[in-house]
Amino acid sequence: EVQLVESGGGLVKPGGSLKLSCAASGFTFSDYYMYWVRQTPEKRLEWVATISDGGSYTYYPDSVKGRFTISRDNAKNNLYLQMSSLKSEDTAMYYCAR
């Protein structure tokens, strides 16, 4: 059974920083590109970041580029999202995805 468990969320003031984690299990983590997406208070789904299977390549929409950093630890089956210079429009529920 594939499981993706996010942690690290919370309330942050504008301009603040936050790091999210995602613990993956039930599949060979290192074989997959991984993603962060978010659901806004208006229930709109937005893509936030993508990282390649080996972690060498990362992709972001312009809305978060330069502020968010996706990374991964294939030895620990963990995915991360470092968010900085947070804005009110970043308010959302964040999810990792395979």
Curated annotation (Swiss-Prot):
Residues 1-98 form the Ig-like domain. Keywords: Adaptive immunity, Immunity, Immunoglobulin. It comes from the Eukaryota. GO terms for cellular component: extracellular region; immunoglobulin complex. This sequence belongs to the VH7183 subfamily. GO terms for biological process: immunoglobulin mediated immune response. InterPro entries: Ig-like_dom (IPR007110), Ig-like_dom_sf (IPR036179), Ig-like_fold (IPR013783), Ig_V-set (IPR013106), IgHV (IPR050199). This is Ig heavy chain V region 6.96. Pfam families: V-set (PF07686). SMART domains: IGv. GO terms for molecular function: antigen binding. PANTHER family: IMMUNOGLOBULIN HEAVY CHAIN.
